[in-house]
């Protein structure tokens, strides 16, 4: 059958032609290699007939790139960009153009993956190290992570950390009544399944009588009130409870740090450091802890180690505490975080430095103080005389009139239950302040009040300690220096703009430029997530259409766009299942069946919702052992809540008996959670909702083109069948009465990056999406066919096919040569490639996923590199040299290696540095040699040393 892709080879306006790598000629050659008569025949041999989608995917006529941009302009025009002074953790900010163009809009940064291969990730690892340093300095604590999903999620994670470490046995946690409402709501969602009681009150008056394991205190408060929290923290310490402070980073440039106040943990958002509000995200949250808590810190941590030459090198530290290793015993289910946004925030600090940040903070505070003086003059005294940037006032009967007058000035005020809130930010001008006064009925001149107004920061809370003392925060004031610094870092990394990233289970496909363009338009970027809905009509039209498309693609009946990552989608999906059982009077159903091959987030997510994990065995061919499943479903029939299963399986194969698996679970009262991580092998060919699944998360940063950003942002919306729809996550701003609370701070998660997936589907259309799936499967089978004789493909279906990825097995070579999977991964760097996924789901193997976006030429380059590496292993087997002396063990080779005066190795410089097929003119050089992971964890360094350390070292 002639497809749209085949017909469009000469059509320059057809986006699918640009997105899909292989040409029609390539496809024909690849089919010959894999031994299939046609793409349709290959699909018939790969997918079980029982799950094939009957009707074609009808998503409307696909648009060209030009038409799509015009359409997005029409949607953008429906959004109204007001000056939002709403606050609640979201602020207007100015993203320096040099950072916007060279980080946010630069594929060298946004197409990279999580830095599991540290040697080729040194640039973004250094940027994240700067982020951690910035957080540690501002919070006054010892160790920070490399970002979390949002402030509310960070608060929930901190509460869980406190529960593990508190000396108090009570399962109660205190929450400051002046926290952001969305933070409290997310914490309630997290606490309820685990049986934790939240006590909300005033920490300065109510803590003494509360038996709690810890407390979250907002600094400054959501109302703007600035309180000395030291008495509350001292009271917590006396109980053996942990003190968590949610702190505003910009305010901390002027205020005493949480560490100085005695806090154990600090959390918050880095959004106002240059990251647009984006109608809710994405933004980088942070968490910092005192040293004793570092091994329980959730999320990624970047540490400093050394490479094979003893030179400094960055790496991800303390990974043994993470979900992919500890599974249901992990500190968190966090996987994807917000790396790209953390990098932007760190670069904002690098560019401005401590003096610039302090100047911005003083300006914001000054304008808030002048605003307060004017409001007092007009008869509206702020609730607190001490504040940083936010004021709360009672307006009485004039409230609605004031809000309306502000709206006429294109200003949004924060509207609380009884008070109005006015939160200023970096973008606030004197004209903005005067407009607010007019809304309150006054005609005042900013300059007159500015001359007589005093600041409102209490002397006892003023910052006296230095911050950002490391030279990196002082050396890049000019745009020239900043530009070169960012370029230097990006040159150290290997991202999709250089080469294929064949990571299995990660779907590193094209992130097309057209898809990325609207992201930075102010009509999408400058909207506050709690702005009136009528100001976001374009967004809501996009949400509605995207939700319908995703339902059509998956066979589900309803979608929630709220989850900010795949792991958070798992959490939301399991909460929906839990809510469904509870509503039916079956809250006792808490057993979650999980195959032994599952991704580590699955058991970690199940534990977070209070479920007990029971592992189901897998057969030798990688399939779920149906007999073991049936036996365990029988055993736990009265308590079975769900099964979590990935499809196609994590072994890279479509299991034939997926319908039977779903039927067994349903027959025993359970629900089927189908992990959507591998949906890129199904779109247009099969729909989870049709063959028995009840709920899935959909990785928009995999299947639907949101870039991975070096480790985030991601999005994991969930699709559900109709019976689970009432249990989708609610939110105080939209569905406050929903039976299941929110999982994210914003009601639509990271709304601004939904534009990327929307445009992708808009331009591909149903036939284009189906073709993308077919080519993804063809590409994987082509790699399997080329490599099978050199590295056996571990799992295939009964017809010898793999799905969209394959696992190759070099384990036998360790016996014959001593080579490890790590040696192969590092040697691939010398060939210019990121390694495939290592040791998952089978230790000692490599899982390869090429995606549909890679051309045959790039697939061949990768296969040639793997085959050349197999020949090098053969030389070790033949005794030419021992593995310790081989180029495999010394990989990756650096410029320092080739420049050595003496070359005392058993192979030539050319063999080591320019292996077969590697160009000498445009070779990628790893900036460091193989990183010493053991040294890094034994000598943990997670932030830049202060400048005083350099002085002491010199002495």
Swiss-Prot record:
Enzyme class label: oxidoreductase
What Enzyme Commission number(s) does the record list for this chain? Answer: 1.4.4.2
Q: Name one GO cellular component term.
A: glycine cleavage complex
Gene Ontology biological process terms in this record = glycine decarboxylation via glycine cleavage system
What keywords were assigned to this record? Oxidoreductase, Pyridoxal phosphate
| Cofactor dependence | pyridoxal 5'-phosphate
Single GO term (MF): pyridoxal phosphate binding
Q: Which NCBIfam families match?
A: gcvP, PRK00451.1, PRK04366.1
Q: Which PANTHER family match?
A: GLYCINE DEHYDROGENASE (DECARBOXYLATING), MITOCHONDRIAL (PTHR11773:SF1), GLYCINE DEHYDROGENASE, DECARBOXYLATING (PTHR11773)
Q: What does it do?
A: The glycine cleavage system catalyzes the degradation of glycine. The P protein binds the alpha-amino group of glycine through its pyridoxal phosphate cofactor; CO(2) is released and the remaining methylamine moiety is then transferred to the lipoamide cofactor of the H protein.
Q: How does it assemble?
A: The glycine cleavage system is composed of four proteins: P, T, L and H.
Supply the name of the protein: Glycine dehydrogenase (decarboxylating)
